[in-house]
Amino acid sequence: MGIRKYKPTTPGRRGSSVADFVEITRSTPEKSLVRPLHSKGGRNNAGRVTVRHQGGGHKRAYRVIDFRRHDKDGVPAKVAHIEYDPNRTARIALLHYADGEKRYIVAPRGLSQGDRVENGPTADIKPGNNLALRNIPVGTTIHAIELRPGGGAKFARSAGASVQLLAKEGTMAHLRMPSGEIRLVDARCRATIGEVGNAEQSNINWGKAGRMRWKGVRPTVRGVAMNPVDHPHGGGEGKTSGGRHPVSPWGQKEGRTRSPKKASNKYIVRRRKTNKKR
């Protein structure tokens, strides 16, 4: 993937950029792997906004991605196409398995049309192959990692994401996460070799608010710009700093939200670095 920069022909184009999509080999998705996707607009079943700053955007169709590949152990597959997916930052690869089944996976860096992909303990250590952590050499870069055996990939699925396998001790594996956190994961959990492709996606400059609206992202209004009825930071004569420590619209203090008593804390060997205070 490369990034194409626009000339400043309009204020919205000044500084903006777009992906060149050179790796895409097909523009229409596999029909059997597409499901309808209904926009929620950030609202729950009662119609109340539970997630702010969502709504509108272009209509999308959901591509069913295979995050559990254990049922295809020993069945080779060929990469038929690399496709665009509007529901994630990474590209997706359409696999044609030898038994005739078709499935999508998140496309790793270096995987291209015509490549061969394998699953299972005997698979080679090359991008796109999926096997258990206990079968992967220490130091290997991996992505799409399960949190629990058979639970499907949960970690490192977005564009450019990768995790490093640092060590294996008994039934557990030490992983360095994209955030810098080092945590323990069951060695029976599966992962895919390589890093997720489309890493340059983070360098795209969206250029104007309208492009974010196409993505379904609505404006974020500062609390100090609101009235007192709308936010604890609202009101005041002229411009103010809010007059108190930063809080949410409901008065919750800004800062870390993870519970110090969370059960999975025992699996975190080293916390990620953060500037937030508890």
Swiss-Prot record:
<dbReference type="InterPro" id="IPR008991">
    <property type="entry name" value="Translation_prot_SH3-like_sf"/>
</dbReference>
<feature type="compositionally biased region" description="Basic residues">
    <location>
        <begin position="258"/>
        <end position="278"/>
    </location>
</feature>
<dbReference type="GO" id="GO:0016740">
    <property type="term" value="F:transferase activity"/>
</dbReference>
<dbReference type="InterPro" id="IPR022666">
    <property type="entry name" value="Ribosomal_uL2_RNA-bd_dom"/>
</dbReference>
<dbReference type="InterPro" id="IPR014722">
    <property type="entry name" value="Rib_uL2_dom2"/>
</dbReference>
<dbReference type="GO" id="GO:0019843">
    <property type="term" value="F:rRNA binding"/>
</dbReference>
<feature type="region of interest" description="Disordered">
    <location>
        <begin position="29"/>
        <end position="57"/>
    </location>
</feature>
<dbReference type="InterPro" id="IPR002171">
    <property type="entry name" value="Ribosomal_uL2"/>
</dbReference>
<dbReference type="InterPro" id="IPR005880">
    <property type="entry name" value="Ribosomal_uL2_bac/org-type"/>
</dbReference>
<keyword id="KW-0687">Ribonucleoprotein</keyword>
<keyword id="KW-0699">rRNA-binding</keyword>
<dbReference type="Pfam" id="PF00181">
    <property type="entry name" value="Ribosomal_L2"/>
</dbReference>
<dbReference type="GO" id="GO:0002181">
    <property type="term" value="P:cytoplasmic translation"/>
</dbReference>
<comment type="function">
    <text>One of the primary rRNA binding proteins. Required for association of the 30S and 50S subunits to form the 70S ribosome, for tRNA binding and peptide bond formation. It has been suggested to have peptidyltransferase activity; this is somewhat controversial. Makes several contacts with the 16S rRNA in the 70S ribosome.</text>
</comment>
<dbReference type="GO" id="GO:0015934">
    <property type="term" value="C:large ribosomal subunit"/>
</dbReference>
<dbReference type="Pfam" id="PF03947">
    <property type="entry name" value="Ribosomal_L2_C"/>
</dbReference>
<comment type="subunit">
    <text>Part of the 50S ribosomal subunit. Forms a bridge to the 30S subunit in the 70S ribosome.</text>
</comment>
<protein>
    <recommendedName>
        <fullName>Large ribosomal subunit protein uL2</fullName>
    </recommendedName>
</protein>
<dbReference type="InterPro" id="IPR022671">
    <property type="entry name" value="Ribosomal_uL2_CS"/>
</dbReference>
<dbReference type="GO" id="GO:0003735">
    <property type="term" value="F:structural constituent of ribosome"/>
</dbReference>
<dbReference type="InterPro" id="IPR012340">
    <property type="entry name" value="NA-bd_OB-fold"/>
</dbReference>
<keyword id="KW-0689">Ribosomal protein</keyword>
<dbReference type="InterPro" id="IPR022669">
    <property type="entry name" value="Ribosomal_uL2_C"/>
</dbReference>
<feature type="region of interest" description="Disordered">
    <location>
        <begin position="224"/>
        <end position="278"/>
    </location>
</feature>
<keyword id="KW-0694">RNA-binding</keyword>
<dbReference type="InterPro" id="IPR014726">
    <property type="entry name" value="Ribosomal_uL2_dom3"/>
</dbReference>
<comment type="similarity">
    <text>Belongs to the universal ribosomal protein uL2 family.</text>
</comment>
